[in-house]
């Protein structure tokens, strides 16, 4: 997953593409390890999602369903990934949660 994911998405926005991004959680990891501003990057991602002309499929992991992590880095990651997922879901036309191969339509 490239760090400049929004630009990569928009590079394929021509109405004829189906684009699969797997996975946003790995992108969030790379942003944190690269000491990038995850909030600003998520802003750019949401703008790219709104501007994309085609069929865009985004995959992310849900990392907030377990116990509270015992270390600061893991808690920060959980929070960054959770905020990113919420913001992406807000601009997405459809949101599915998949567990054990079973889809649950959230939006």
Predicted region positions:
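Conserved inter-motif catalytic segment of the P-loop NTP-binding fold
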Residues: 1-44
């Amino acid at each position: 997953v490239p760090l400049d994911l929004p630009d990569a998405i928009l590079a394929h926005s021509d109405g004829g593409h189906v684009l699969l991004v797997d996975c946003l959680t790995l992108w969030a990891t790379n942003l944190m390890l690269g000491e990038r501003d995850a909030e600003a990057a998520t802003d750019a991602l949401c703008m790219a999602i709104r501007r994309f002309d085609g069929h865009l499929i985004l995959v992310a992991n849900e990392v907030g369903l377990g116990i509270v992590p015992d270390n600061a880095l893991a808690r920060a990651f959980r929070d960054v990934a959770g905020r990113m997922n919420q913001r992406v879901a807000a601009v997405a036309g459809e949101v599915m949660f998949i567990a054990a191969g079973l889809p649950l339509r959230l939006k």
